UniProtKB/Swiss-Prot annotation:
GO terms for biological process: provirus excision. GO terms for cellular component: host cell cytoplasm. Belongs to the mulikevirus small terminase family. Keywords: DNA-binding, Host cytoplasm, Late protein, Viral genome excision, Viral genome packaging, Viral release from host cell. Heterodimer with the terminase large subunit gp28; the active complex is probably heterooligomeric. This is Probable terminase, small subunit gp27. The terminase small subunit binds to the packaging initiation site (pac) and regulates the ATPase activity of the terminase large subunit. The terminase lies at a unique vertex of the procapsid and is composed of two subunits, a small terminase subunit involved in viral DNA recognition (packaging sequence), and a large terminase subunit possessing endonucleolytic and ATPase activities. Both terminase subunits heterooligomerize and are docked on the portal protein to form the packaging machine.
Length: 191
């Protein structure tokens, strides 16, 4: 079996950064056939003065391209799920800390998916993901409670102001009960 050995980097991982970057750009462009990618990358390897052993084989490039495509597919799925979650949350408040924790959980999920793709028999640290998501849920719940409490305080303050204005205006010449009620409604945000 041609399995990656633990701790051993692939040929692509050992390539210079500029060659790897070019490879990734070419793989993203679906119009470029793998045969041409192989030719150009091997030419870049040769131009860089690297030994012939560093050149990519057709099957090695295909394996790497398949891996990259699988990762891309998983990322697209994750983005769709994130978009759906964001749409579901709507305009509910979400603090920066919550966003950060969700991003960290997303990152950990991505890393776990990558490990699973590279080695299907490996264990995924579900506890870490579960704890991160639980922390995000608790943080979101706290943020919602805080938002609700802040709203209640604002409402109480508005009622207090409306009562004070109503008492001040009550009995004033030229102020009808209807006008007084309209002013009160404006202060309470009901107008």
């Amino acid at each position: 079996m041609d399995r990656k050995t633990r701790g051993r980097a692939s040929k692509v991982d050992l390539l210079p950064e500029n060659v790897r970057k070019t490879l990734h750009e070419m793989l993203r462009d679906k119009a470029i056939p793998q045969a041409r990618i192989l030719e150009e990358i091997n030419a870049l390897i040769e131009d860089a003065g690297l030994p012939d052993e560093m050149k990519l084989s057709r099957s090695g490039l295909n394996r790497y391209a398949t891996n990259v495509e699988q990762v891309g597919h998983n990322l697209r799925q994750m983005r769709e799920m994130t978009s759906a979650l964001t749409a579901e949350l709507g305009d509910k408040p979400m603090g920066e800390t919550t966003k950060l924790i969700l991003e960290m959980a997303r990152s950990q999920l991505f890393k776990a998916m990558m490990r699973q793709i590279e080695n299907p028999e490996s264990d995924v640290d579900i506890d870490l993901l579960k704890n991160a998501m639980l922390a995000a849920q608790r943080l979101e719940s706290t943020a919602m409670s805080s938002h609700r409490r802040e709203k209640e305080i604002r409402q109480a303050f508005a009622e207090e102001a409306a009562n004070a204005v109503s008492e001040e205006l009550r009995g004033q010449d030229g102020i009808s009960e209807e006008l007084e009620q309209r002013i009160r409604d404006v202060l309470l945000g009901k107008a």
